[in-house]
Amino acid sequence: MSNIPAELKYIASHEWLRLEDDGTITVGITDHAQDLLGDVVFVELPDVGDIIAVDDEISVVESVKAASDVYAPISGEVVAINEALEDDPEIINSDPYGEGWFFRMKPDNIADYEALLTADEYENEL
């Protein structure tokens, strides 16, 4: 069974979100997603300053098995990206909920975050 931290929010397309103390939201892919992908070899990230809307294609993850799009879970502005992934994308495999985060965003509406799946709800989607 995949690791599904209870303190995070999720969407059915296997992204996780964490609300930070400063009101930004960190986004990455779940342990289940990285397991399905296999060894990650490349990640294309959004640009800082990008304005994104729900369901926009915002990143691409390439692995030895497949390429997969990552979609915006909520609307907002990208305020930081994980530049470490450019040189070391396999961090996603070893630490998907920690050092393997993709980007941080300032949400347009925090209620959109609150409405996402809980860990239990996400687990039921698997």
UniProtKB/Swiss-Prot annotation:
Cofactor remark from the record: Binds 1 lipoyl cofactor covalently.
Keyword Zinc among record annotations: no
Gene3D superfamilies: 2.40.50.100
GO cellular component, as recorded: cytosol; glycine cleavage complex
CDD domains cross-referenced by the UniProt entry: GCS_H
Keyword Ribosomal protein included in the entry's annotation: no
Family, similarity comment: Belongs to the GcvH family.
Biological role stated in the UniProt entry: The glycine cleavage system catalyzes the degradation of glycine. The H protein shuttles the methylamine group of glycine from the P protein to the T protein.
Protein's name according to its UniProt entry: Glycine cleavage system H protein
Natural source organism: Psychrobacter arcticus (strain DSM 17307 / VKM B-2377 / 273-4)
Gene name, Swiss-Prot/TrEMBL: gcvH
